[in-house]
A protein has these predicted regions:
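Non-catalytic, surface beta->alpha helical segment in thiol-disulfide oxidoreductase systems
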Residues: 104-132
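Signal peptide-proximal N-terminal region
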Residues: 64-74
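Local sequence-structure signature of Cys/Sec-based thiol-disulfide redox active-site neighborhoods
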Residues: 34-65
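Bacterial signal peptide processing site
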Residues: 20-23
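Thiol-based oxidoreductase modules, predominantly thioredoxin-like and allied folds used
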Residues: 72-86
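Structural micro-motif
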Residues: 92-106
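Positively charged n-region of N-terminal signal peptides that target proteins for export
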Residues: 1-4
């Protein structure tokens, strides 16, 4: 009985993990922000589910729609950060991030939007309102 339960649990975990998509971080992580810069960071692991990918896609789209001029000038940015990548560890440590997170940072002050961001991951309008 124990072996059957273990086998079923292992199979379920395998199915759950196979739904995640491997994706490399292609964005460079900037060092510290100046007084006028605002950055939205989406911290994630290498393996991500559909909701995780939706948070990134809709957050990035919202930032680009809300602040097009600021994005062009570099005073407002969206950065996807893979926290499994050791090169990003110092940024995650500096901001106190240990897992998946959606945060807005200005002058080393951060607003954590993780809970609401994941709750509204598939609702672009609500996520856009959060990032306003």
């Amino acid at each position: 009985m124990k072996q059957t339960l273990l086998l079923i649990t292992s199979f379920a975990m395998l199915l759950f993990n196979s739904g995640c998509k491997n994706q490399e971080n292609k964005n460079a992580v900037p060092p510290a922000l100046s007084d006028s810069e605002v950055s939205v960071y989406y911290f994630h692991f290498t393996n991500r589910c559909a909701t995780c990918l939706a948070v990134e896609e809709n957050s990035k789209k919202a930032v680009e729609e809300l602040y097009p001029n600021e994005v062009k000038t570099g005073t407002y940015s969206f950065t996807s950060v893979n926290i499994d990548d050791k090169a990003n560890k110092s940024l995650a440590d500096r901001l106190g991030i240990g897992g998946q997170a959606l945060v807005v940072v200005r002058n080393d002050k951060k607003i954590d939007l993780t809970s609401d961001g994941f709750l509204n991951a598939h609702d672009h309008a609500k996520l856009k309102e959060l990032l306003k």
